[in-house]
């Protein structure tokens, strides 16, 4: 189980990226392509519409991996809290950066507002997990861990497939045959139980 001492230092962009990646099961490219227009913190929804891709050695915004990867997710409370704090820090950073800031509306940009290269996310996560004694973690491990945690919490396979935007299994295909833009809500409650504040007993 990922505990308090395993997170990177509080009040850093990496912390928010890890929380969202782990609780929502996003692909690294989907995570880095998120724009604030894709996030509705008032109602707790996140829309996955794009992905960061590499074209001739450069990163740019592109399509998601598959049509089923374009999805709408209910944000667990831990992710909502992390994103609210992250947005406030980003606003402060934008003011400090001044005219050097390039406003593309990205949730997890570079220090000047541009697209973050996935290799930089991978390097930062590797440093954080090594420091926490967790060994070598690739950003995809957040996605895999989300699936494992939800499975252990008893979430049905079909709902996990919806959350992850899978399209390669028969079960996932049968779900998307009937609804092309699902709002995945069932996975949020188990993630809140796993990562939310302790419940009174």
Q: Across the structure, where does each feature detected by a protein language model lie?
A:
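C-terminal catalytic core of tyrosine-transesterase DNA break-rejoin enzymes
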Residues: 12, 19, 23-30, 119-120, ...
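C-terminal secondary-structure termini that scaffold catalytic or DNA-interacting sites
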Residues: 8, 43, 52-79, 89-96, ...
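Amphipathic, well-packed alpha-helical segments that form the structural scaffold of globular domains
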Residues: 3, 84-88, 122-130
């Amino acid at each position: 189980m990922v505990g308090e001492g395993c997170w990177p230092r509080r009040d850093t962009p990496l912390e928010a990226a890890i929380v969202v990646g782990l609780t929502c099961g996003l692909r690294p490219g989907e995570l880095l392509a998120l724009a604030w227009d894709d996030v509705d913190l008032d109602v707790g929804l996140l829309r996955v519409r794009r992905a960061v891709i590499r074209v001739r050695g450069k990163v740019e915004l592109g399509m998601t991996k598959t049509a089923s990867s374009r999805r709408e997710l209910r944000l667990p409370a831990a992710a909502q809290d992390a994103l609210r704090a992250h947005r406030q820090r980003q606003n402060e950073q934008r003011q400090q950066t001044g005219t050097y800031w390039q406003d593309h509306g990205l949730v997890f940009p570079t220090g000047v507002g541009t697209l973050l290269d996935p290799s930089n996310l991978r390097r930062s996560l590797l440093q954080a997990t090594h420091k926490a004694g967790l060994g070598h973690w690739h950003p995809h491990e957040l996605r895999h861990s989300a699936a494992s945690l939800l499975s252990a919490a008893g979430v049905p396979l079909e709902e996990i497939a919806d959350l992850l935007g899978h399209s390669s299994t028969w079960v996932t295909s049968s779900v998307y045959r009937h609804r092309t833009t699902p709002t995945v809500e069932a996975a949020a409650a188990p993630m809140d139980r796993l990562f939310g504040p302790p419940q009174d007993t």
